[in-house]
């Protein structure tokens, strides 16, 4: 394999070719920074968190593929991943994970001690998550914690503390993550049943759409509370209304539980998150 092909495999292992996960991590993180700052966050903190989201998402993808390397070859969507296909060795993947982890830790060292302390919890959660799919039917609920951990870290970086209001946004993102990652799990449900991978899509069974709807409603309520606790106004309210529209559209997409529309519903959440962030930021400007 040429150096160019090897570098391409490393980039795909870190999902640099599929930024959807980075965006889904980024929007709530940016919302947390804006809410904590009451508008424009500190530029240094903003840059560190944007880079940190990219790096930690890569870490999560690498350790996930390491954990699933023997199973991914049996799943249609994942059989071409670099570890499953043999393009990247286990040793290479672990080295890349350590390098990315050290880079992320170097970033948080530029922030206050509370952020550093919270970062240790974050990396532990990131390492544990991929293995939860073997022991629990609710790995999406654990993922919700992992993908929401940047929120208290963002508040801590901006304020030096994590106020009660931060947990409304944390709860909102947790519920939202469970909802959209269950949509994602619906894509792989048949393959997961064959290889023994557990998920909320399997756990919820024929009630999957209804339970996803309940999580979407819970996320909506918590996003509203996060906005109210920060005295947000009409522009953010318009973002909330748009978020409702996205949720209804996603319910339509997953109605027949077909793979392609379920994947489309998952991907649509990027736009929902972007609208929430943009309207929140605009609400502070207007």
Swiss-Prot record:
Coiled-coil regions, chain positions: none
Per its record, what are the GO molecular function terms? 4-hydroxybenzoate polyprenyltransferase activity
Give the cofactors, semicolon-separated.
Answer: Mg(2+)
State the compartments where it is located.
Answer: Cell inner membrane
User: Reaction(s) catalyzed by this protein?
Assistant: all-trans-octaprenyl diphosphate + 4-hydroxybenzoate = 4-hydroxy-3-(all-trans-octaprenyl)benzoate + diphosphate
Instruction: Classify the main location.
Output: membrane
| Pathway membership, UniProt | Cofactor biosynthesis; ubiquinone biosynthesis
TM segments? 20-40, 43-63, 95-115, 116-136, 142-162, 167-187, 210-230, 235-255
User: Which InterPro entries would you find in this protein's record?
Assistant: HB_polyprenyltransferase-like (IPR006370), Prenyltransferase (IPR039653), UbiA_prenyltransferase (IPR000537), UbiA_prenylTrfase_CS (IPR030470), UbiA_sf (IPR044878)
Q: Mind telling me which HAMAP family this protein's record contains?
A: UbiA
Q: What does this protein do?
A: Catalyzes the prenylation of para-hydroxybenzoate (PHB) with an all-trans polyprenyl group. Mediates the second step in the final reaction sequence of ubiquinone-8 (UQ-8) biosynthesis, which is the condensation of the polyisoprenoid side chain with PHB, generating the first membrane-bound Q intermediate 3-octaprenyl-4-hydroxybenzoate.
Return the protein name: 4-hydroxybenzoate octaprenyltransferase
Source organism per entry reads Shewanella loihica (strain ATCC BAA-1088 / PV-4)
Q: Which gene encodes it?
A: ubiA
């Amino acid at each position: 394999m040429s150096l160019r092909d090897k570098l391409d495999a490393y980039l795909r292992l870190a999902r640099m070719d599929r930024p959807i996960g980075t965006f889904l991590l980024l929007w709530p993180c940016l919302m947390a920074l804006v809410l904590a700052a009451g508008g424009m966050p500190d530029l240094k903190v903003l840059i560190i968190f944007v880079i940190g989201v990219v790096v930690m998402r890569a870490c999560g993808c690498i350790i996930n593929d390491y954990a699933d390397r023997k199973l991914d070859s049996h799943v249609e969507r994942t059989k071409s991943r670099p570890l499953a296909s043999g393009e990247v060795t286990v040793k290479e993947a672990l080295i890349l994970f350590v390098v990315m982890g050290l880079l992320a830790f170097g970033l948080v060292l530029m922030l206050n001690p509370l952020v550093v302390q919270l970062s240790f919890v974050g990396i532990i959660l990131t390492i544990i998550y991929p293995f939860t799919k073997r022991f629990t039917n609710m790995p999406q609920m654990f993922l919700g914690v992992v993908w929401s951990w940047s929120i208290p870290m963002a508040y801590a970086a901006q304020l030096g503390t994590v106020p009660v209001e931060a947990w409304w946004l944390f709860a909102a993102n947790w519920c939202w993550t469970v909802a959209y990652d269950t949509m994602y799990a619906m894509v792989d449900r048949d393959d997961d049943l064959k290889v023994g991978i557990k998920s909320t899509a399997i756990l919820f069974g024929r009630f999957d759409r209804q339970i996803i709807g309940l999580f979407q409603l819970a996320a909506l309520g918590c996003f509203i509370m996060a906005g109210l606790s920060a005295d947000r106004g009409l522009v953010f309210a318009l973002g909330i209304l748009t978020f409702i529209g996205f949720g209804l559209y996603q319910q339509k997409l997953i109605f027949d539980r077909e793979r392609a529309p379920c994947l489309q519903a998952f991907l649509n959440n990027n736009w929902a998150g972007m609208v929430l962030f943009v309207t929140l930021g605009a609400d502070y400007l207007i």
